[in-house]
Amino acid sequence: TDAVADGVHAISGVVDT
């Protein structure tokens, strides 16, 4: 996975976009 996508996922937390 892309680092950016991973970062966003971490920030999103429970919310998976």
Swiss-Prot record:
Keywords assigned by UniProt, alphabetized: Secreted
Keyword Repeat: no
Protein localization: Secreted
CC terms in the record's Gene Ontology section: extracellular region
Disulfide bonds: none
Reported tissue expression: Expressed in skin glands.
Its job: May act as an antimicrobial peptide.
The family this protein is said to belong to: Belongs to the Frog skin active peptide (FSAP) family. Septenin subfamily.
Designated name of the protein: Septenin 1f
